[in-house]
A protein has these predicted regions:
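Alpha-helical multi-pass membrane segments and their bilayer interfacial helix-loop junctions
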Residues: 1-405
């Protein structure tokens, strides 16, 4: 909730006598944008200071004696951690967390620099995993979102580095990230953290499939397991944040199947998983998902699984079925957004419907229509749909607000 939103909705609460004018002013006073902006400054300053120190040390590293290098690493890291703890005890949380984050960055930089000093050869990302584990422990110690995001970034980048540099996937890094940071996400029920965790998990699942050269459909088993976990979260916003990235991944896959699938040239070996195991896994996840939805009284959201229908195993009509799935899913999101009067879901559904329409337009007209005419008509169609859907959204939301009076 932001100050701007409170200032917009507050007068209506006063008008309905839900709160008094004095209470409204007190609530607005709790959301001081100036204090929030000032609180961000130490975090930004810590990032700039860390980059400056790393740049300076890297530029002069070879000229510094080895013993002094090691001493510098220990002193800088200790100073940041000590300073962070001192400021936290003084009640200056933002500055304390910023210095602690610099200590974490210094720890990771120290691992790399010590390896260079003693010419240590790495064959995996164990050192990065230790760095991420340290960040996870600090996250629990200080209950900090900033440290959480840094730790999540460390694990994600480390996994990418492992697959690119060493051509191997680190199950240890994934397990520590999923269990350690996943449990913290479950505890905090914070929308931003949940979004970021979901994105990192999906990206690492993609890296796993690519590194192991498995059939691509296996990607959706762990991804939809994450989606299923979201059905057991009571808070709607947090559950939706956990599920949105898996749904986006399934939506993009459906778009690819519509636009690029060709039975004559497509390689099924790179795409299709073993039917019995894959479909059985999806059915099991679907059952657990529906059970969670029914428990949370969100049974209608089971329709979201239409994007996971295994149309790709059919012998014909694959593009048409995936295109229909795109439209049905878009209509469903719009419909739920209007029923729940949830502006984010309405906007998201509007975007999905426009994307689905443009995918259908491109699929049906690209091969035979003049390209200039294709883009002109496509632009006009896009503008018309955008205008109509936004107008419809405003009308429905206005009617809903009018009905509350």
């Amino acid at each position: 909730m932001s100050r701007k939103w409170v200032e917009k909705e507050g007068p209506r609460w006063v008008e309905k006598e839900i709160i008094t004018r004095e209470q409204y002013e007190q609530i607005v006073g709790l959301y001081d944008d100036g204090k929030h902006a000032i609180g961000i400054l130490p975090l930004l300053g810590s990032v700039l200071l860390g980059l400056g120190i790393l740049s300076f040390v890297a530029a002069n590293w070879q000229d510094i004696p080895q013993l002094l290098r090691l001493s510098m690493i220990i002193v800088i890291m200790t100073a940041f951690y000590t300073g962070g703890e001192w400021f936290l005890r003084k009640g200056q949380d933002k500055l304390g967390i910023a210095l602690t984050a610099l200590g974490l960055v210094s720890f990771g930089g120290g691992i790399v620099l010590v390896g260079q000093m003693f010419h240590l050869v790495a064959y995996d990302i164990t050192s990065f995993t230790v760095w991420g584990l340290a960040g996870t422990l600090l996250t629990y110690m200080y209950r900090s979102r900033f440290l959480y995001l840094i730790s999540l970034l460390i694990f994600t980048v480390a996994q990418w580095y492992s697959t690119e540099q060493f051509h191997q996937y680190s199950y240890a890094a994934l397990a520590i990230m999923a269990i350690g940071l996943g449990y913290f996400t479950w505890q905090r029920q914070n929308t931003l953290l949940t979004w970021c965790f979901s994105l990192s998990f999906v990206l690492q699942c993609m890296m796993l499939i690519v590194d192991k050269d498995w059939a691509f459909l296996w990607f959706f088993i762990p991804v939809m397991a994450l989606y299923t976990a979201g059905d057991w979260i009571k808070d709607r916003s947090t559950g939706y944040a956990l599920q949105t990235v898996p749904l986006i991944a399934a939506y993009i896959f459906a778009i690819v199947m519509v636009l690029m699938w060709d039975e004559r040239t497509s390689s099924l070996d790179k795409l299709l998983a073993m039917p019995a195991a894959y479909i059985g896994g999806l059915v099991l996840l679907l059952a657990v998902s529906v059970a969670g939805k029914l428990k949370q009284q969100r049974g209608s959201s089971a329709f979201e699984w239409i994007l996971l229908a295994p149309f790709v195993y059919l012998s014909a009509g694959i593009e048409v079925l995936y295109l229909l799935a795109l439209f049905f899913f878009s209509f469903y999101v719009l419909w739920r957004g209007y029923i729940e009067q949830w502006r984010f879901k309405i906007n998201f559904g509007t975007l999905l419907f426009i994307c689905s329409t443009m995918v259908a337009y491109g699929k049906l007209t690209w091969d035979f229509m003049d390209k200039s005419l294709f883009f002109i008509l496509g632009g006009l169609l896009l503008l018309t749909l955008s205008w109509f859907l936004n107008r419809r959204k405003k009308q429905i939301l206005a009617d809903a607000k009018g009905g509350e009076h």
